[in-house]
């Protein structure tokens, strides 16, 4: 009887253990543009986030995104598209950002980056990040038309307006200089 | 012998009544309904899929389970294929449920379409984001996230990756139009109050000034600027009433005469 009770207790404890057992490292990888607009020949910032949601550290983590930004259509201004982290502890996260510069305008499909990591030095895992999807790379001129400071426009505007403002002011000055005495008399 | 036959007859009669009851057909068809419900519940998780869920924004939502209205809520779903066949992650559906009754939907969000193929021994991360509307501010709701996926044979699976009650808080960090307009209203009210009080005070002071003047007033004859009055008019006046003193004074002068 006692033995059977113990056996039952053991079964119950092992069931609980299954419910709360520690999970291996599980990395969620996140790729996200931080710039609102992608414009040709202007900086574009990308951020990669790695979140270890498992209960054990992930070893030898790499991010590889070289294939999604071919160098014939993108300049890499700052940062690396292939990064290596020795370890990401459980429950912590890493962010990595890269500044690139598109060389041409048009639609571009932002694909997933590849992340690899090891759990227990043995199990090799391959993870693909989310895909930001298709985005439009603006033409420089289009972007300037909407957002650049319009100094030349103002200059041209002032030149056009000059005959009616500056011209009339000069005429007024001339006529005023013609009657200096009359004005003095009135004021006294 | 007689007693036994009576018992037998009674038993027969009872059976007949019971049978009649059954024939009446009052027993409803419960059984098929139950089986249908069972069929619905058979769409479950696949043993070869491992899923994970993590809030990215706000970053403390994983622990405290709180959102702010009007600010983006972003989360990641990890999908791990532990089996030997491909999986296709079709979509994830997010919904707010009534906290005490999760079968009651408060809001269904646009489902995130992914259609991502996950090869064996591979993992994929999916992202989704939404805004909690202001009307949910200050109350708990049940957030439910289900992931729908298919295996290579076309079997459909559904995994529940998040099913918790979360608190939605009002965002009071930034400028809110309501308090801003309240402030402007109070400023306007105080300016109006100042104006009214100023008006009232000036009225009071003017009254006192008038009464004083009434006592002191003695006519304006001495201060008349005669340059402004035509000559003949002044002469006429002098002819008609040479005396500039008051009638009382005149009377007293006559008496004296």
From Swiss-Prot, chain A:
Q: One Pfam annotation, family name?
A: TRAP_beta
Cellular component terms, GO, for this chain's entry? endoplasmic reticulum membrane
> Which parts of the chain span the membrane according to its record?
152-172
Which stretch is the leader sequence?
1-15
Q: Which domain of life is it from?
A: Eukaryota
The entry's localization annotation reads: Endoplasmic reticulum membrane
Membrane topology per the entry is:
Single-pass type I membrane protein
Q: Which residues lie on this side of the membrane: Lumenal?
A: 16-151
Q: Which residues are glycosylated?
A: 93, 109
- The residues exposed to the Cytoplasmic compartment are 173-188
Answer whether the UniProt record assigns the keyword Membrane to this protein.
yes
Keywords assigned: Endoplasmic reticulum, Glycoprotein, Membrane, Signal, Transmembrane, Transmembrane helix
According to its UniProt record, where is this protein mainly located?
A: endoplasmic reticulum
Role of this protein: TRAP proteins are part of a complex whose function is to bind calcium to the ER membrane and thereby regulate the retention of ER resident proteins.
Complex and partners? Heterotetramer of TRAP-alpha, TRAP-beta, TRAP-delta and TRAP-gamma.
Tell me the protein family, please. Belongs to the TRAP-beta family.
Q: What is this protein called?
A: Translocon-associated protein subunit beta
Q: Which gene encodes it?
A: trap-2
